[in-house]
C-alpha cells in the first residue's frame, strides 16, 4: 500500500500563489521564498521570510506550483511538521507558520517558544 510521503515542512496553495505574485513583481523567476527562525519576538523565537536567489548546501527546497520554499537545517529543526500559509484579513495580509512544535505563540503569531 502506497502512502504519500509527508514533507518535514510544507506550504499551502495560498502561500504558493502569493509567492508567485511577489516574484512576478521582482521580474526574477529564480527567486525562492526562504523561511527561517531567529531569536527575538515576545516568545523567544520569531519567523522570518525573505526572497532569496540561492539554495545553500544543506537547505531543504520544496517545490509547488512552480515556486520554491527553502529552509536552512537549523531553522528546519524548529519547523518540522509545520505549514507555511498566506492569510488575508481586514487587519493584515502575511505569511504565517502553523508550527506543531510551538508551545506558545504571541497574539500576532510571528513569535513562538518551544
Curated annotation (Swiss-Prot):
Record key words, sorted: Iron, Iron-sulfur, Metal-binding
Cofactor: iron-sulfur cluster
Pfam families: Fe-S_biosyn
Binding residues annotated for iron-sulfur cluster, in chain numbering: 42, 106, 108
HAMAP family the UniProt entry points to: Fe_S_insert_ErpA
Subunit structure: Homodimer.
Name the record gives this protein: Iron-sulfur cluster insertion protein ErpA
Species: Hamiltonella defensa subsp. Acyrthosiphon pisum (strain 5AT)
Gene: erpA
Amino acid at each position: 500500500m502506497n502512502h504519500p510521503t509527508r514533507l518535514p515542512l510544507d506550504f499551502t496553495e495560498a502561500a504558493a500563489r502569493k509567492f508567485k505574485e511577489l516574484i512576478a513583481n521582482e521580474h526574477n523567476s529564480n527567486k525562492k521564498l526562504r523561511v527561517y527562525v531567529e531569536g527575538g519576538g515576545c516568545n523567544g523565537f520569531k519567523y522570518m521570510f525573505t526572497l532569496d536567489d540561492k539554495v545553500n548546501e544543506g537547505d531543504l527546497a520544496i517545490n509547488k506550483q512552480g515556486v520554491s520554499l527553502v529552509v536552512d537545517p537549523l531553522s528546519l529543526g524548529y519547523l518540522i511538521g509545520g505549514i507555511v500559509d498566506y492569510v488575508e484579513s481586514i487587519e493584515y495580509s502575511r505569511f504565517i507558520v502553523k508550527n506543531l512544535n510551538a508551545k506558545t505563540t504571541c497574539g500576532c503569531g510571528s513569535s513562538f517558544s518551544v
